Amino acid sequence: MFSIFIKIILILPSIATKTNNIDIKSWRSAQTFDGFGAVSGGGATSKLLFTYFSEKSDRKQVLESLFNKDNGLQLLKVEMGGDDQSTEGTESSHESEKGKISKNNYEFQLISEVREINPTIPICVLPWAFPGWIGNTPYDNVTETAEYVVNWLKIGRDTWNFDTFCVGVWNERNFSESYVKELRKILNLNGFNETLIVAGEGFRMDDSYSRLLDKRFINEYDIIGVHYPGGRIPENVQKSGKVIWASEDYSTDNRDTGEGCMARTMNWNFINGNITGMISWHLMSAFYPQLPWYRCGLARIDENKFQTEKAFHVLKYITSHVKRGWKILRESSGRFDGGGTYVTYTNGKDSTIFVETMSYKKSLCEYSSPRPYHVKPSQLIRFKFSEIPSFQGLNMSLNFGPSKFFSKSVNSTITILLPVNSFGILTTLPVSTPKRVTIKTPLVPLNYHDDFENYEFDEEPKFWMPQKGSWVVRNGRAVQKVTRPSISWCTSHIRTPYAVMAYRKKNSILNAEVNIPKHSTAKSIILGIRSNCSGCDIEVINCRGIFVEIEFSNKKVTIFSDFVDRSIIAEFKARRKVEFGKFYKFSIHLLDSHLFIKFGNHHVMTSVEIPEEQLNKTNNDTLFVIGTGNFGISEWDNISTDYFH
């Protein structure tokens, strides 16, 4: 039996010495460490990885830096796409229409490539939205919803050769006991007996906790998932015997307090909440900087480079020196008297202690900040170890500094000085100091053009970030495939499928060939420039832009701004016939105060004067928009952009 004795003595400047004795002689208080991971999704957050690093060999470098077995992430959680907005954009569903299975969602490709780097990494999945054919809610027909979810797991197993470690219920929305029971049944019937169910998955779970602990339900699921808990887990939940995860956490701007938030949260979750696993949102900001929550992940990608963020480097202090399955020692973890925390991990042979003394202001998180507290300017910490015969000393690294070796004294003590706003490790292992990884992006062409010929069936178009509905490539065309509103996670009142792409030059032209098939329920197409429409808040802010809508049934053309509550600028009839079932080429661009609209290959353009107020409002907005006026199939080809001086 492994035994460890740790004594921690704090000597604070100018005050009497205080001693905090911790005596561990067995693993009776140890808990299994489930790992630190990240979420891909919750809004197509990894989408542009496949645009900027289109070659698999280039992506391998990126994913190696995030998931290598030596110091990478230990869990990967992905969104189960539902064709609807889920923060940064939509993720394509694997079954947008009942019985029509799509197997090339980019998350499947991401999982496959991550598993080539780390074949044993656990994969978890959670829906944000659901396709509309399921009903008004996921719980209208629990069997149908469970079968829909299990179909995703089947694709993973049968097509992409991975097993799903855990599956959630519905992101940050109410759960249903009857659905969870049915999901367990359907999982087992399809050979997924080992797949765990994560229940909860919400903010502010006061009522949810009592339901989760109901003796008639508590054995129907495996993990209690909590989002942004800040370590605040009720005592009865901590003592319930259920595994508790922060199944979504972090999401804090790395340009501000992200690094400190991560350092504090990693420890506080366990010390305050008995939380043994943490999954950070989001894996990478692989979306346009114009979209919300940019640089609130563990890495970022733009047209110039991939780069890891400091929050990930903090996390790597643990992932480099602690593995899933190690034990967290409850009685060897706690708070320093002068502020700050320490958590001890061990595998019975080696040990790692993560320490942090982050101040309140330097560790604020977007969602889970505590009440104000105070940390002493510096603290002298004396660790005392005994009953570990092979133990000679500890390697220490603080704040990404070089490693230092501290030999234990005759009485098995090691003394360190911890200033405020410090974080790092003491470990029996050689120290791997986290460092930033930067990988240059392959050259991105100045002008965009795509004929959609070199795609797998149902692969998602590059560069475009759908914000409502979903585009996939089929037979050389980008198809908006959603025919009815989804069970929405946000933007539930929006009935306009649309996608956005950032443009690189101010004076830009958008060209597209578009067909609305005869059988489609879509009635019009929309092109837009100088827009800021993205994310979940478009209804609140009434997102802006300069948009052109062409109705196929009556040739009516409407120019408008303000996407939700439209401000009409002009209306007129197109000069040429526009029919369903035929492709037409459309172009729009803005020159000074004039919007030019071009139909087909004709040289004649229609010019509309844009009011100065609308020009001023959209002057700094840089998103192109494509879409349809309502749900229904539309086909897009030869989309391109040009710019002029």
Curated annotation (Swiss-Prot):
Keywords, in A-Z order: Disulfide bond, Glycoprotein, Glycosidase, Hydrolase, Lipid degradation, Lipid metabolism, Signal, Sphingolipid metabolism
Which residues, renumbered to this chain, are glycosylated? N141, N174, N193, N274, N395, N411, N532, N616, N620, N638
Q: Which terms under GO biological process does the entry name?
A: galactosylceramide catabolic process
Q: Which Pfam families match?
A: Glyco_hydro_59, Glyco_hydro_59_C, Glyco_hydro_59M
Question: Which residues are named in the active-site annotation?
Answer: E172, E248
GO cellular component terms, alphabetically, are:
lysosome; membrane
The catalysed reaction is: a beta-D-Gal-(1<->1')-ceramide + H2O = an N-acyl-sphingoid base + D-galactose; a beta-D-galactosyl-(1<->1')-N-acylsphing-4-enine + H2O = an N-acylsphing-4-enine + D-galactose
Q: Which residues bind substrate?
A: T87, W128, N171
Domain of life, per UniProt, equals Eukaryota
Leader peptide range in chain numbering: 1-16
Q: EC number(s) in its UniProt entry?
A: 3.2.1.46
Q: Name one GO molecular function term.
A: galactosylceramidase activity
Disulfide bridge partners, by residue number: C261-C365
The first-level EC class reads hydrolase
Q: Which InterPro entries match?
A: Aldolase_TIM, GH59_C, GH59_cat, Glyco_hydro_59, Glyco_hydro_59_dom, Glycoside_hydrolase_SF
As for what it does, the entry says: Hydrolyzes the galactose ester bonds of galactosylceramide, galactosylsphingoid base, lactosylceramide, and monogalactosyldiglyceride. C.elegans contain specific sphingoid bases, which are unique or different in structure compared to the sphingoid bases found in other animals. Two examples of these distinctive compounds are: 15-methylhexadecasphinganine and 15-methylhexadecasphing-4-enine.
Q: What does the sequence similarity comment in the record state about its family?
A: Belongs to the glycosyl hydrolase 59 family.
The protein depicted here goes by the name Putative galactocerebrosidase
Instruction: Tell me what organism the protein belongs to.
Output: Caenorhabditis elegans
